[in-house]
């Protein structure tokens, strides 16, 4: 198994400096990760830094709260793609889901899917804030709206991916969608366990340590 191609090598900290982003890009080139995941302000820089590789540039939309309007999320998506993004990780409207406004949750996801054209869209459900029933419902809505992946977490809330959540999400969407486990993978064994539970992508800042068989520090 080429575990490197499961990994979105991630740096989303608000105080990330250019030299840290450059280090992320260098590691991505060396280890040939699936993508780097960076904030929108770094997309253009990342695209240039990964020229000549097949490492994708992933960025986030409506991040980390998901509480911006659908129009803003659609604009963010279009701008990110213009700047070179290959993949979009959007955050759902958690408050709308909790309020039972499923039509808004679905239309919000659909707005990003439509704005993305042929680019990959991953839907962050922020599983740590949801009941199991809400997790099932929002995964179904993401599937209905035409998204490519469901993703567990932003890494900025109360918890990251769990094996139980990845298993439930995979059972819900079947084989038609990707499942991304974000946060929680600190070692090779962790990453492998998520893959065995049904994850097809792993979001982590610890990609290098994972591939080296080391235990990483940090919380994402």
Swiss-Prot record:
Record pathway: Carbohydrate degradation; 2-deoxy-D-ribose 1-phosphate degradation; D-glyceraldehyde 3-phosphate and acetaldehyde from 2-deoxy-alpha-D-ribose 1-phosphate: step 2/2
CDD domains: DeoC (cd00959)
Enzyme active site: 89 (proton donor/acceptor), 151 (schiff-base intermediate with acetaldehyde), 180 (proton donor/acceptor)
SMART domains with a match to the protein in the record: DeoC
Keywords of the record: Cytoplasm, Lyase, Schiff base
Catalysed reactions, semicolon-separated: 2-deoxy-D-ribose 5-phosphate = D-glyceraldehyde 3-phosphate + acetaldehyde
tRNA processing is among the record's keywords: no
UniProt superkingdom: Bacteria
Localization terms from the record: Cytoplasm
One Gene Ontology term from the biological process aspect of the record: carbohydrate catabolic process
EC code: 4.1.2.4
Chief location of this protein within or outside the cell: cytoplasm
InterPro entries linked to this entry: Aldolase_TIM, DeoC, DeoC/FbaB/LacD_aldolase, DeoC_typeI
A single GO cellular-component term on record: cytoplasm
GO molecular function per UniProt: deoxyribose-phosphate aldolase activity
Function: Catalyzes a reversible aldol reaction between acetaldehyde and D-glyceraldehyde 3-phosphate to generate 2-deoxy-D-ribose 5-phosphate.
Family as reported in the entry's similarity comment: Belongs to the DeoC/FbaB aldolase family. DeoC type 1 subfamily.
Name of the protein described by the UniProt record: Deoxyribose-phosphate aldolase
Taxonomic source organism: Streptococcus pneumoniae serotype 4 (strain ATCC BAA-334 / TIGR4)
Gene of this entry: deoC
